[in-house]
Amino acid sequence: MLRLFYFSAIIASVILNFVGIIMNLFITVVNCKTWVKSHRISSSDRILFSLGITRFLMLGLFLVNTIYFVSSNTERSVYLSAFFVLCFMFLDSSSVWFVTLLNILYCVKITNFQHSVFLLLKRNISPKIPRLLLACVLISAFTTCLYITLSQASPFPELVTTRNNTSFNISEGILSLVVSLVLSSSLQFIINVTSASLLIHSLRRHIQKMQKNATGFWNPQTEAHVGAMKLMVYFLILYIPYSVATLVQYLPFYAGMDMGTKSICLIFATLYSPGHSVLIIITHPKLKTTAKKILCFKK
């Protein structure tokens, strides 16, 4: 039963990743065409362009790895499997850092906090976006290299099977690997949740203020604010389970977990990228308009 559930989770993840590939290819092409036509691109679209490319490569790599894994006629190589994992880890980390940067940009640009730090960021963050994107890539490369180093230095935990369950013999090296993974994920998690929460709070307060002062409450500006607030709420719903599931998947003793736990982690980890990409498209005016034209919908 658990094997069937795990196999169903793999099929669902393949379908979701295929959808994610199409969505991110769409985001990349639309932003690229805008960039070529106008010879300039906004800070948020620059991040979306980088995010679309990274997720397209990451999800494509996942599909290739899945086909390689389930193929019975292919001789599996340990080194090739490790290469897949490390490349996926680097691309996944880069995409999350790009999303983190995008959330920071939205938080700084949209919120009306008068703190000196917010005012300083509001004035200076847009020109720094190219450098910040490069910093995201370098941080992801560093964390991936750190994972490789600690994995090589730390032997994987030995499985000790008892009558009722399976326990692990965890060394100090394994603990250092786990601590490094938790610390690297925690920084992204704290920044994302904080920026999204601040933006939701600011937008909710702004909408309440408009509702009290305006005679006609529902207008295009209010609709845009509500859309941004919904995007952040749905982002948190997708991001928080994804962060936990991804962290569990990278832990050394993940291989010894039961099929049910692996299936749940796989579904949550896979749902985030395609789901967030769809949210970006339906809340971004230019992407939404282009998508409607492609689908032959009229306004």
Curated annotation (Swiss-Prot):
One Pfam family in the UniProt entry: TAS2R
Main location group: membrane
Transmembrane segments: 10-30, 47-67, 82-102, 132-152, 173-193, 231-251, 263-283
Subcellular localization, as worded in the UniProt entry: Membrane; Cell projection, Cilium membrane
Glycosylation sites: N164, N165, N169
UniProt membrane topology term: Multi-pass membrane protein
Topological domains annotated Extracellular: 1-9, 68-81, 153-172, 252-262
Cytoplasmic-side segments: 31-46, 103-131, 194-230, 284-299
Keywords on record: Cell membrane, Cell projection, Cilium, G-protein coupled receptor, Glycoprotein, Membrane, Receptor, Sensory transduction, Taste, Transducer, Transmembrane, Transmembrane helix
Other comments on record: Several bitter taste receptors are expressed in a single taste receptor cell.
Protein name stated in the entry: Taste receptor type 2 member 4
Family annotation (Gene3D superfamilies): Rhodopsin 7-helix transmembrane proteins
Disulfide bond entries: none
Tissue spec. comment: Expressed in subsets of taste receptor cells of the tongue and palate epithelium and exclusively in gustducin-positive cells. Expressed on airway ciliated epithelium.
Example of a GO cellular component annotation carried by this entry: plasma membrane
GO biological process: detection of chemical stimulus involved in sensory perception of bitter taste; respiratory gaseous exchange by respiratory system
Family from the record: Belongs to the G-protein coupled receptor T2R family.
GO MF, one example: G protein-coupled receptor activity
Domain of life: Eukaryota
Role: Gustducin-coupled receptor for denatonium and N(6)-propyl-2-thiouracil implicated in the perception of bitter compounds in the oral cavity and the gastrointestinal tract. Signals through PLCB2 and the calcium-regulated cation channel TRPM5. In airway epithelial cells, binding of denatonium increases the intracellular calcium ion concentration and stimulates ciliary beat frequency.
